[in-house]
């Protein structure tokens, strides 16, 4: 590990020199690429330097113990040795995590697709609860939320809705939300007070650049039509709504949120690219490790990941067996406690994999 850390530190110094070179700065595209690489290494280098400093201090204190006869100074050195030993253990763990293979999509913006599942109108209302939860979470993170497409019901639910969430680390946090979410509660329309179980499916897709995926224009069928609102009534007198079908896969994306047909087409294309990229990534991951099932979950949208139980005020994440009794604040966007636990479990799984490889 130390050999790799020394290499990273040297690389960081090399990049520091490059990004301050006027000749490199003249090429803005290359300079921005180098700046990003430099920023990615910074936390590793800073942690490694802190680790080296703690090691030096530890050796210094050990030397003092050998040479010092003063009782008070020896006790101080022993106390410092104890603290530094614990600190070095913590820093070593931090460095191990920082050196784990990074998901190349972690820094990307995301699309979140929420679809009502089993449960009719109640499932559609639950889909709207989930949308609000992610919107409130994004607000806490100072991320931007943009509606891409939606299919609303008459009572305020959503049959399906897609939003873009833009901000630093959006995918790295939200990627764990893909899967089936289950709600247990008494619907407002239920006169007997019987608890119903409904579901909604969430898919989290990283936004992709044109370089990440190439779409042949001949593989697309683009239809335009008039946008409709609740209950199907027409809300636009022009054909501004857009439906794009990717013929080889049968994937269909619609967008009618904007008044401009061009803007709707741009939005629909972004979502289509993200879906195609996700499908390609899933296929690649399956071929690499088809027998590995991560304890954190596969990210498969058919996997039941979480239950929201209203009578008990309970949320249970089935992937890690975590139960919290804070349903109200959780649905108000306070979801970091679960996400942190999922991140920790994911890192532990990666460390196990690394150990098997080594």
Swiss-Prot record:
SMART domains named in the record? PCRF (SM00937)
Gene Ontology cellular-component terms for this entry are: cytoplasm
Q: Name one GO molecular function term.
A: translation release factor activity, codon specific
Residues the record lists as N5-methylglutamine modifications: 233
**Which domain of life does this protein belong to?**
Bacteria
The record's account of how the chain is modified after translation = Methylated by PrmC. Methylation increases the termination efficiency of RF1.
According to its UniProt record, where is this protein located? Cytoplasm
Q: Does the keyword Ribonucleoprotein apply?
A: no
Q: What keyword terms does UniProt attach to this protein?
A: Cytoplasm, Methylation, Protein biosynthesis
Q: Which cysteines are joined by disulfide bonds?
A: none
The family line of this record is: Belongs to the prokaryotic/mitochondrial release factor family.
Summarizing the function annotation, the protein's role is: Peptide chain release factor 1 directs the termination of translation in response to the peptide chain termination codons UAG and UAA.
The protein's name is Peptide chain release factor 1
Species of origin reads Clostridium botulinum (strain Kyoto / Type A2)
Organism classification, top ranks? Bacteria, Bacillati, Bacillota, Clostridia, Eubacteriales
């Amino acid at each position: 590990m130390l050999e790799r850390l020394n290499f990273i530190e040297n690389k960081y110094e090399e990049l520091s020199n490059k990004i301050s070179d006027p000749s490199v700065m003249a090429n803005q595209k290359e300079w921005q690429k180098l700046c990003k690489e430099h920023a990615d290494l910074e936390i590793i280098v800073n942690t490694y330097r802190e680790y080296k400093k703690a090691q030096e201090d530890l050796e210094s204190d050990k030397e003092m113990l050998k040479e010092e006869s003063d009782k008070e100074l020896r006790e101080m050195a022993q106390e410092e040795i104890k603290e530094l030993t614990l600190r070095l253990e913590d820093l070593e763990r931090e460095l191990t995590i920082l050196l784990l293979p990074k998901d190349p999509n972690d820094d990307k913006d995301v699309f979140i697709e929420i679809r009502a599942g089993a449960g009719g109108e109640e499932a559609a209302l639950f889909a709207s609860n989930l949308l609000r939860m992610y919107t409130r979470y994004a607000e806490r993170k100072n991320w931007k939320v943009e509606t891409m497409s939606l299919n609303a019901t008459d009572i305020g639910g959503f049959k399906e809705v897609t939003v873009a969430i833009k901000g630093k680390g959006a995918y790295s946090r939200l990627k764990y939300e893909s899967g089936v979410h289950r709600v247990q509660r008494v619907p407002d329309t239920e006169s007997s007070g019987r608890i119903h179980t409904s579901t909604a499916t969430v898919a989290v897709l990283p936004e992709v650049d044109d370089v990440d995926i190439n779409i042949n224009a001949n593989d697309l069928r683009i239809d335009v039509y008039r946008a409709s609102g609740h209950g199907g009534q027409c809300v636009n007198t022009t054909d501004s709504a857009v439906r794009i079908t990717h013929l080889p896969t049968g994937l269909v994306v619609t967008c009618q949120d904007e008044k401009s047909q061009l803007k709707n087409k741009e939005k629909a294309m972004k979502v289509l690219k993200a879906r195609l990229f996700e499908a390609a990534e899933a296929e690649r991951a399956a071929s690499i490790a088809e027998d590995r099932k991560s304890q954190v979950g596969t990210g498969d949208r058919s996997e039941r990941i979480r239950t929201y139980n209203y009578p008990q005020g309970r949320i249970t994440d089935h992937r890690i067996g975590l139960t919290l009794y804070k349903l109200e604040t959780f649905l108000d966007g306070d979801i970091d406690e679960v996400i942190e636990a999922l991140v920790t479990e994911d890192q532990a799984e990666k460390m196990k994999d690394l150990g098997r490889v080594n």
